[in-house]
């Protein structure tokens, strides 16, 4: 299911951020922002704001 797939992508983006691979995380978060549910989009947006800081 697409929602579950986006949850997995959010987890993957967090893992990339922890490893310092912000470029990979940004790419995944962009996809979640395009295809995720409202709740997933909020989570992706919050993670993206952490990348910017």
Language model feature labels by segment:
Residues 1-27, 35-43, 49-53:
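Intrinsically disordered, low-complexity acidic segments enriched in Asp/Glu and Pro
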